[in-house]
Amino acid sequence: MITKLLTKVIGSRNDRTLRRLRKIVKEINNYEPTFEALSDEELKAKTVEFRERLEQGETLDKLLPEAFATVREASKRVYGMRHFDVQLIGGMVLNGGQIAEMRTGEGKTLTATLPAYLNALPGKGVHVVTVNDYLATRDAETNRPLFEFLGMTVGVNVPNMPPQAKKEAYQADILYGTNNEFGFDYLRDNMAFRNEDRVQRERFFAVVDEVDSILIDEARTPLIISGPAEDSSDLYTRINLLIPQLQKQDKEDSEEYRGDGHYTVDEKSKQVHLTETGQEFVEELMVKNGLMEEGDTLYSPTNISLLHHVNAALRAHVLFERNVDYIVNEDGEVVIVDEHTGRTMPGRRWSEGLHQAVEAKEGVKIQNENQTLASITFQNYFRLYEKLSGMTGTADTEAFEFQSIYGLETVVIPTNKPMIRNDMPDVVYRTEAEKFAAIIEDIKERVEKGQPSLVGTVSIEKSELLSNALKKAKIKHNVLNAKFHEREAEIVAEAGTPGAVTIATNMAGRGTDIVLGGSWQAKVEALQDPTKEQIDAIKAEWKQVHDQVLESGGLHIIGTERHESRRIDNQLRGRSGRQGDAGSSRFYLSMEDSLLRIFTSDRMASLIQSGMEEGEAIESKMLSRSIEKAQRKVEGRNFDIRKQLLEYDDVANDQRKVVYELRDELMSVDDISDMIEQNREDVITAIIDEYIPPQSLEDMWDVEGLQERLKADFDLDAPIKQWLEEDDKLYEEALREKITNLAVEVYKAKEEVVGAQVLRNFEKSVMLQTLDTLWKEHLAAMDHLRQGIHLRGYAQKNPKQEYKRESFELFEGLLEALKTDVITVLSRVRVQQQEEVERMEEQRRAQAEEAARRAQAQHAAAQNPLSEGEESEEGAHQPMVREERKVGRNEPCPCGSGKKYKQCHGKID
């Protein structure tokens, strides 16, 4: 009550922010007459002037009013477009490292030019991030004339660019690209073997367009660079044949109830689990088909891989539906459909064997599984930027998440013209058939009065179902979904013409405005070298049609189902009513819709259906509240999942930072001999300690064992017995020194044969490749650990704490193994001449580069942080564990502090 009263008196935080920014808008507007009087050359010279002032110590905030005024004036001259005051406010919000919520049609692309120009002045580069290649290329080409007029360079970052072109693109002042490509470039840079092969420079400032889609919808989907693993396509095919024999059980097993079904499905969390009966039945089938020994169990450590395959096949059959989650294209490939945009994602593959299981289910060629070489989530990639900002039409519903995870405040920017769209209440029918009949009637009415309609569906399957119903009703329409995305621009250009009917899966076509009356630009582009008269005639004709559409009520939005997230519903609505245009929207629902079926209580469902007759609709505030409550519930659960995922990924992220910093250090220096020398001392000392324990009696020494170990591991012939016989006063410390000195002498002899520089290059090459191999193994071990960690909850242990503890132990093993493996390789290598080492180094590099070339970028399946594990605790990461290892005292501490281990957590040991 008091909060509401205070808000009325002093305004909300958003109101106060807007008041503060409007004062700066006045300042920018005051520069307008002065800048209008400047010649083109004088206006262009402003960029050089601003850069000089920055060098003299002026801040970007101090330059902001003049810089924004410069961009606005340049835009007027280049495009004949003047930034509105609300766009200036949006630009300031972005410059402040915040999220600007701007409605569809308010000119987000033009708004982004303001902070992009200002933040490109220091010369560190600005990244403008979009959701797909088409938008990245379109926005770069649209804004290129403006930035080049002001003396700035513009680049585009899209997949499959040649390395040199990509490197040049990153040197541009302003770089447009997709979120995936920026993330993958970061991972690829951290797999490179030479500095000149890296493309990215520092991550200074990013403007993320459609920020909700990238930082929220895709937050659960890690980016993965993977390489080929072993072929197990036959196993997928054989297990795929068993799954159709399993029966679904509606209720979970409990102490009081044990069903006779084989698996249960949790639709809320999108999980499928084998029941006890199911496990026994699958084991029987496996034995019968020669996949398992009699009396063996699926959950024994030796059968981990079989359980993994069964789970993948079960998920493929039960949770993943053709034409909803994926399509099979003409080439017989399974292509993922993005659940948020309805677009296909060629080249992306689900991980953990799921893609292969779907291929087996569809009977197409099964491609090899991949092994993770590097991975990162968008959450952690975008937090690497010094300053991050974003734009979207719908962020307010997720403002809390942006603030708590990314530290980004959301500012709602007012529209340039008042919004007059009529958002009508939802109507609910008993069945889907009744709902579709009502939608067809609504569309008929709109077509008759010449009003364009955009119909949003949640899947390809539903869009085709509706399309067939419209064909029967003889209503002409266009379908925009993953199957027909090649015609996307053409369909969107026509979607605003009188009486047009467009069915769009989810938010396909997002990023392109639907212009009432159709797109006159598309008609102009269709002409070859159009004259001014032709362009004027097209514009005049368009104006007439535009006014006609406005009179008919503007664009009408029909939602065929409520999405789990209110934000996606708002995005669909936001396609209408742009820039103060007329428009309307309505959602048609049925009690068979998944959201209502899963999340509405049985009491509410029976209450609604009891008084309804066939074809009758219900409009109820209580029902609308119930639906919104269900959506909030789902949003809350999804937020918790993303937050938990981040907490787990933060553990890997701290370790990733240590590994990548070590890699950076190795890449930036030519001579790592000091590091090698220190590592050699640490490794040999650790081995000596095993056979000659510190401060022990001579009777406890295993001299023969030590001699054999030094020979086997390091090819070192140390005559320790002889030394002890020759000098009976040779004590433990002096002996240690003697062995270390001998190892150094032997190594120095190699250096004399091949030359110092050749050996330095070889050391660096061995160190980098060993680090990459161990990191790859470590990622696999972390995956296995993660999948089985939820089982610790049954032992009254905190899975998160256990995960942190065990992953730290794994990381200790990695750092110790790095030293041991590098010293072993360098010690055992035998050389006669310089050319041999050069040839070996070239061979190792060629192998590594071939592996990198064969690596592919992919998305993992969206993760649940505590999903049902496919591994038992014992089998989860056993093969990867290196026992009896410790972090080297001079290594970076795995906690990520940046200090040496001995000066940080090493003090505690």
Swiss-Prot record:
Pfam families: P-loop_SecA, SEC-C, SecA_DEAD, SecA_PP_bind, SecA_SW. ATP binds at residues 87, 105-109, 513. GO terms for biological process: intracellular protein transmembrane transport; protein import; protein targeting; protein transport by the Sec complex. Monomer and homodimer. Part of the essential Sec protein translocation apparatus which comprises SecA, SecYEG and auxiliary proteins SecDF-YajC and YidC. GO terms for cellular component: cell envelope Sec protein transport complex; cytosol; plasma membrane. One of its GO terms (molecular function) is protein-exporting ATPase activity. The keyword Cell inner membrane applies. It is found in: Cell inner membrane; Cytoplasm. It comes from Vibrio campbellii (strain ATCC BAA-1116). The lineage of its organism: Bacteria, Pseudomonadati, Pseudomonadota, Gammaproteobacteria, Vibrionales. May bind 1 zinc ion per subunit. This is Protein translocase subunit SecA. Its EC number is 7.4.2.8. Residues 836-853, 874-889 have a biased composition (Basic and acidic residues). Gene3D superfamilies: Helical scaffold and wing domains of SecA (1.10.3060.10), P-loop containing nucleotide triphosphate hydrolases (3.40.50.300), SecA, preprotein cross-linking domain (3.90.1440.10). Residues 834-909 are annotated as: Disordered. Belongs to the SecA family. Coiled coil: none annotated. It is a peripheral membrane protein. Zn(2+) binds at residues 893, 895, 904-905. Residues 899-909 have a biased composition (Basic residues).
